[in-house]
């Protein structure tokens, strides 16, 4: 069964949390897929992951089709595809339930600093439970 965990964001710092979570899961020996909205977000996150924390190294690649990234433990992706068989999905944007069901562990964000984003997160939380996912707050 897919386990979905929500991370509460009190400030718009999703990129930092994406990096922290990716590093934690990587250090535990997992392959991770990070899904973002578009190429601009993917390139920005790719660059940020190299510099976000002094002394931190997170091996990753943006699957832009120009580089072979299948051996990387962390892949940044725009489309709902899992090219390296990751079991961990970190959602920088919402994904379909069908896609989420292919992962053991999914991270979503409750962006409580914004009323509309918080409402959207509550709706996703309820939908995940109704779908049969195991849902919790992280």
Tell me the role of every PLM-derived stretch.
Residues 1-42:
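Long, hydrophobic N-terminal alpha-helical segment
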Residues 29, 72, 86-87, 103-104:
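Short, well-ordered alpha-helix to beta-strand connector turns
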Residues 34, 74-77, 87-92:
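Short, hydrophobic beta-strand segments that form beta-sheet elements in well-ordered domains
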Residues 46-84:
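Helix-adjacent hinge/juxtasegments
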